[in-house]
UniProtKB/Swiss-Prot annotation:
Residues 9-18 have a biased composition (Polar residues). The complex is composed of two ATP-binding proteins (PstB), two transmembrane proteins (PstC and PstA) and a solute-binding protein (PstS). It comes from the Archaea. ATP binds at residues 63-70. Keywords: ATP-binding, Cell membrane, Membrane, Nucleotide-binding, Phosphate transport, Plasmid, Translocase, Transport. GO terms for biological process: phosphate ion transmembrane transport. This is Phosphate import ATP-binding protein PstB 3. The gene is pstB3. SUPFAM superfamilies: P-loop containing nucleoside triphosphate hydrolases. Belongs to the ABC transporter superfamily. Phosphate importer (TC 3.A.1.7) family.
Length: 275
């Protein structure tokens, strides 16, 4: 289990985490949002979202298109900084530190909170260079052991270990997405954000990613946006339901969300009455 760090941990200090068995220990919060509002110009994308994300669990974010799921995800590692006219109010607290404080380095933050996107986006570089990018951007040397560790962690090593100098673009779509996961875990983050990571993949490749997520959560916290409610029910421990207007309407154990939701709107969404 990760130990508590001082407030300057997001600026320069590396953090080690120990794998924990899912469900064996009480939930520890790794990311907390407090009254989080997001606007794109005059349009509000998130409205007063407060939530505690548990460590070493899979948390799924579900809801209809345009409800703020991806916006919420991008707030956690400040990817919204790259969007013009985006204004973030409230707090996103990671290990006791508001990530929007002026002294937080977004690049250092993204080393600790990695991200995998909807469409596989390997760089037009070799498999090896894709993996080590996350380390080299921090000015750190990358060893062959680092490459192997990340590729094994992404369940890709056995498929590519004889072609590390080949282009990552030559891989299949599912392999490219696992390469992107390897790139995300190479810097040894604590949290991995996934924005619909299987939506562009065929069912077989998507199933491999789901199996991989189940393995990753032994060492990392995973927060995943998905439109596939069956996927959310299969792979997640917690589920947050967002609805139109950027409102978080319910957050609970996934079993409770899908079998006994408290909010009628959540039941209507899950049963397909709207969405």
């Amino acid at each position: 289990m990760a130990t508590q760090e001082t407030d300057d941990s997001l600026i320069s200090t590396d953090v080690q985490t120990d794998a924990t068995e899912r469900g064996d220990q009480p939930d520890e919060t790794v990311v907390e949002t407090k009254h989080l509002d997001v606007h794109y110009g005059d349009e509000q994308a998130l409205d007063d979202v407060s939530i505690d994300i548990p460590e070493n669990k899979v948390t799924a974010l579900i809801g209809p298109s345009g409800c703020g799921k991806s916006t919420f995800l991008r707030c956690i590692n400040r990817m919204n900084d790259q969007i013009d006219a985006c204004r973030v109010d409230g707090k996103v607290v990671f290990k006791g530190k508001n990530v929007y404080d002026d002294d937080v380095d977004p690049v250092a933050l993204r080393r600790k909170i990695g991200q995998v996107f909807q469409t596989p986006n390997p760089f037009p570089k070799s498999i090896r260079e894709n993996v080590v990018y996350g380390l080299e951007v921090q000015g750190e040397p990358a060893s062959d052991e680092d490459v192997e560790r990340a590729l094994r962690g992404a369940a890709l090593w056995d498929e590519v270990n004889n072609q590390l100098d080949s282009s990552g673009l030559d891989l299949s779509g599912g392999q490219q997405q696992r390469l992107c996961i390897a790139r995300a875990i190479a810097p040894d983050p604590e949290v991995i954000l996934m924005d619909e990571p299987t939506s562009a993949l065929d069912p077989v490749a998507a199933s491999k990613i789901e199996d991989l997520i189940d393995e990753l959560v032994e060492d990392y916290t995973v927060i995943i946006v998905t439109h596939n409610m069956q996927q959310a029910a299969r792979i997640s421990d917690k589920t947050a339901v967002f609805l139109t207007g950027g409102n978080l309407v319910e957050f609970d154990d996934t079993t409770n969300i899908f079998e006994n939701p408290e909010d009628d709107r959540v039941e209507d969404y899950i049963t397909g009455k709207f969405g």
